[in-house]
Amino acid sequence: MESEGFSATTEQYEYYDYANETGLQPCDETDWDFSYSLLPVFYMIVFVLGLSGNGVVIFTVWKAKPKRRSADTYIGNLALADLAFVVTLPLWATYTALGFHWPFGSALCKLSSYLVLLNMFASVFCLTCLSFDRYLAIVHSLSSAKLRSRSSILVSLAVIWLFSGLLALPSLILRDTRVEGNNTICDLDFSGVSSKENENFWIGGLSILTTVPGFLLPLLLMTIFYCFIGGKVTMHFQNLKKEEQKKKRLLKIIITLVVVFAICWLPFHILKTIHFLDLMGFLELSCSAQNIIVSLHPYATCLAYVNSCLNPFLYAFFDLRFRSQCFFFFGFKKVLQGHLSNTSSSLSAQTQKSEIHSLATKV
């Protein structure tokens, strides 16, 4: 039994038509009344937190340019990718609140969908490069200077944005508006590239495109990097120098970012993979199972969206250097001095003064 299709009414990545996909009898429709009210509120919360948080990260990284760590450059671009996505959330909130009616025209339908997918790819690629950077810094600290130079980092960022842009292109090309009843919906339109009978193959291909290079492969690479890093740190744990301890603290922050990213995106990709297997005939889901997936899907998507506003708060919570930079660049020097006083009461006034400057500017 083939799937009825993954309704894209709550899915900004692949807007699948839940109705009659291949002439099959549809399952009972899911009641979306609760989602119409809840999801827009949730989107706007993510928008406000993501806009302010990622804006602070970008500003802080930009201001720290003379003494910027290599990791900071990737973190700044990660924040930029998240920011590009969260600015589209008011549009999706309006779309959902209006009962999935898109009043913004075809161009914004295409652009907003493109930015969502661009964010997903750019975020995971930035995290992968962050992990690789830590691998080089800790496992090959002496021989990796050239690979971690400013020019190499800029080249890697150019590759990240180029590949992210290319992988997100199907959304820009295939997404369009169409009238359905009294609503104008923002939907994937395969009519220009495929017959109705072959649409499932296009849907399956797009599903693989988002899950394999956008989640599974980067997660595998990051796991390999951290296995090597873990072995290195364990072997030399007792003899870590001060500089190595700084690398270890930064490593904890990056691992936290990766774990949170995986937790936020895993339910989305699991549901999408189950749908893909059902669509291609590898699974036979009952109507009740399909309805469960349909009901869970918007909330799995929301969890994925949360990742775009969480990262700045993770930096602030785990990274004293980032907090200090924020206080320093936004003029909260008294707050920073008080924080240092509480955490290091034995420091002399002169040491404390130099520590403020060091935390705010040192590599």
Curated annotation (Swiss-Prot):
This is Apelin receptor B. It comes from Xenopus laevis (African clawed frog). Glycans are attached at N20, N182. Belongs to the G-protein coupled receptor 1 family. InterPro entries: ATII_rcpt, CCR1-9-like, GPCR_Rhodpsn, GPCR_Rhodpsn_7TM. One of its GO terms (cellular component) is external side of plasma membrane. GO terms for biological process: angiogenesis; apelin receptor signaling pathway; blood vessel development; branching involved in blood vessel morphogenesis; calcium-mediated signaling; cell differentiation; gastrulation; heart development. It is found in: Cell membrane. The lineage of its organism: Eukaryota, Metazoa, Chordata, Craniata, Vertebrata. The gene is aplnr-b.
